[in-house]
């Protein structure tokens, strides 16, 4: 699996066991990602932070 890093078009290949790409952003500024990369389990959203997770190459 290949996931974008914080600034596309940079990306990296995920290590074994991290089978999701994710994008984390603040609820107040949804168009500005705070963090991107590979993750094993999609974190829960909170009142301030949202996570978008997906399992195809460079989908974040």
Swiss-Prot record:
Disulphide bonds in the chain: 3-21, 14-38, 42-53, 54-59
PROSITE patterns associated with the record: SNAKE_TOXIN
One Pfam short name: Toxin_cobra-type
InterPro entries recorded: Cytotoxin_Cobra (IPR003572), Snake_3FTx (IPR003571), Snake_toxin-like_sf (IPR045860), Snake_toxin_con_site (IPR018354), Toxin_cobra-type (IPR054131)
UniProt main location, coarse: secreted
Gene Ontology cellular-component terms listed: extracellular region; membrane; other organism cell membrane
Tissue-level expression: Expressed by the venom gland.
One annotated GO molecular function: toxin activity
Highest taxon in the source lineage: Eukaryota
Biological processes annotated in GO: killing of cells of another organism
Keyword entries, A-Z: Cardiotoxin, Cytolysis, Disulfide bond, Membrane, Secreted, Target cell membrane, Target membrane, Toxin
Family: Belongs to the three-finger toxin family. Short-chain subfamily. Type IA cytotoxin sub-subfamily.
Further comment: Shows very weak hemolytic activity.
Functional summary from the UniProt entry: Shows cytolytic activity on many different cells by forming pore in lipid membranes. In vivo, increases heart rate or kills the animal by cardiac arrest. In addition, it binds to heparin with high affinity, interacts with Kv channel-interacting protein 1 (KCNIP1) in a calcium-independent manner, and binds to integrin alpha-V/beta-3 (ITGAV/ITGB3) with moderate affinity.
Protein name: Cytotoxin 2
Organism, scientific name: Naja nivea
